[in-house]
C-alpha cells in the first residue's frame, strides 16, 4: 500500500497532526496532483476554530498548485506531468446552478464537500492505513497529494512559478469574482476595500486592473496598508487612527465610493462599508464570518439611497480561472509579491497560528515538499 503525508485536523483547535494516509486514487473524471504549494487562508482558520462546522478528522487546504501525477478514466483536459492549479470551488458541472453558469454556488459542492467532506459520489478520497475515512475540505491540499475533479484543474502558463500560483485558486479567484462578476467594476469607478488581508489585497489590485480610478484601502495594520499601496491603492486609511467612513467621504468630496468591498466578515466593518458608499452604490460582502454573526442595517438609508448589498463567494472555475491565469501571466496582477511566508508540511499549524494572530502579511503558503 502506497502512502502519503498529510496535516490532519483531528479536533477543533490550531494544531495539525502530520500522519500517513493511503495515497488517494483518482476515479472517473478526476485528477491526482502532487502538491507543490497550498495557500494558508482564513476560511480554513474558521474551520479550525470551530466557527464553521466541518467533519473531523479532516484535511484542510483549498487553493493548490502542483504537478499532475495520475488521471482517472475520461480525463482529457490535462495530462500527467502538466503544471496545474485548482480553485477552491470545484464545480460538479451538472447541478441546476452549474448548467446556468453559476458554478460559484454549485449545489453539489456545498451539499457534499462543504457539509460532508466528500466528493460528488458521496465518498472521500482520503483514508487512514486501516481504512478509516478522513474528510476533505475542497481538495484537501495540506497533503503531499490531492485528488480534484477535472472541472477544476487548469494548466499554469510557462513563466509563472508553480509554488506562487497556488494563491490564484482562492485569494485571487475570489477577488476576480467579486470585482468582475458581482460589482462589475467599470473604468473610472471609485472603490473602497475594507480589510486588506490576503483577499483584500487582491481586491485592490484586481479593481485597479479592471479600471478603478481610486482605490481606498482600509485596515488597522500599517504594513498591510503599505503593501496595498504597492499593489495599486491610491489612498490608504488606518481605521485604528481615523474614522474610516469620514475619511472615505473626505477623499471622495463627500459623495462616498461607487463600490465598497468588505473582506473581513465582521459586523462593524460591514456597517462601515454600507455607510461609505455613494447613492446608488454597491456593497459587496466577501469576507467569511463565523456562523451566526449579524450586522445592523439602516433600512431607510439603504432603500432611499438605492444601495445594493451583494454577496460574493468565489468565482466560476471554468469561466474565470483562465482569465485569472492570463492576468497573472501578463503581469497585470502580482502573486509573488503577495507571498511573505513559506512553510513545510510539518510547520503548517505554525502558519495558521501566525495567521490567527494577524501576523501574516499578504499570504503564506505550505509547500509539502519543503
Region spans (language model):
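Cysteine-cluster motifs in flexible loop/terminal segments that predominantly coordinate metals
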Residues: 88-145, 149-151
